[in-house]
Amino acid sequence: ETSGMTRYYPKYYRQTLNSIKDSLDILQAQGYRNIELSAIYEGDPSVWGGLGATNNYAIDPSIGTLEDFEDLLREVHARDMRLTFFGNVGYCWYKAPFFEKACDDQRNGVYSKERNWFHFSDKKLNDNWFWSDRAQAYYYSCWGNSDGAEGRIPSYNFNNWEWQEECRNYLDFWADKGVDGILLDAPEVYDGITDDIINESIIKVLNRRGILTNAEGASNIEKWISRFDFKLIQGFDMYGWGGGKRSEVLNARRNQNPCELNGKLKSYRDRIVALGATTITPPMWEIPATNEERLFELAYLISM
């Protein structure tokens, strides 16, 4: 089965869970069978729609409550639709209470699980290390130099067993709510990640529940599909976002040369399908386009 999926950024666009619930009949009539909610937990919406959490286990009060979320999920399932949760176990928001505690414990030399969830250093080892007055040390942030981030998204330390355990708790919590899919933000670049850690801390948790998941930005397609049994792959062969905005579909349309897409389809989409998985490729809304160009882009992506 295939259908369109529509993604919501509730915190960023100030949409409540109840307003999304009220739109379900319209979405169903339009042919959507899956809705995706991005970063609905507590967190500042200013960077990437709020992917950096301040509380991984609570709905952001600006969009509703856990009860509202559970009600929305029931209404989605009552219509034979699916709900996918886009979350993040790679980094948090720098004002998260648990990161502030980690900084305090680092400064005071106190052992704690929160302190061990992050990487601290007395030295600036490279440009991904940012100074914290509170910790009196540098902390690691993989995406800290990205547009708008400015070091405000400290990375979790996957090389630490206490964070691995917390990651499993996080995934279990949202899976227990009954979501149908959990999409993860760029797992290949989690701090300290290895294949074994991914398998134990993420894959086994989701696979034992039969939950759909997606490796955003996956480069080694064969590994993610064949070894980790991912059924949905969101790579960047057809488009790029953030600091590298790119749409191969729009480029081909503007150059009046559809042959430009052949190589991309063979090297990316066809490989994924041959391995038994599905691609997820959204329109590149960050690139301005005419109505005609946007319709062409949408039609092409739907046909993939």
Where are these regions (language model features)?
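Active-site-proximal helices and loops of the catalytic beta/alpha 8
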Residues: 73-82, 91, 169-172, 180-276, ...
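Substrate-binding/active-site clefts of carbohydrate-active enzymes
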Residues: 1-33, 39-177, 201-208, 223
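Short loop/turn segments at strand-loop or loop-helix junctions that form parts
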Residues: 1-3, 39-40, 236-241, 276-281
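Flexible glycine/proline-enriched surface loops and loop-helix/loop-strand junctions
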Residues: 152, 281-283
